[in-house]
Amino acid sequence: PHAVVKLNLFEGGSMVHRELIASGIVSIFQKLYAHSWGPRLEYILRNTLLTLLSQNAKLEDILRMLTDERYRHKVVESLDDLVLKNFWETEFNKMQEKQRIEAISPILNKVGQFVTSPLVRNVVNTNQSSFSIEDVMNSGKILLVNLSQGKLGEDNTALLGAMLITKIQLAAMNRVYIPEEE
């Protein structure tokens, strides 16, 4: 029996990297759902991601941020970023309930599809990844990942594969901060 690998896209989010991480996650969902993508969906998702990247968040917290008023208030109160704070307080919270439900439904649908899958949830519902892509890259290790569509299903395979590629891209971009002599 193989141990379940844990993967959290939200970790490692220093101020410099948060925008890259949010952009990477938005790109994943945009590629998976290109046929039903829109500017409002992207705007709300991006603001949600940037907000959660300042927390110790995981994928399912996107749903919680959009639907749980008490949780959202607590998170927004802790924000240092005034632009994000303004989004939640003057845009999102001022929407009529019907308008808000209409705006967040596509996000809940897309993210919820993966969070409700026990297979995906076992991998992404974690505050810390079980391995470091940076460590794999910087120490010359080999990473083998079984993303069999027969075991996971096509959508789940696409999501997990895209998440892994995004983590690899972010780790590669972080290498610019490693001194040349290392």
Please place each PLM-identified region on the residue numbering:
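P-loop NTPase motor domains
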Residues: P1-E182
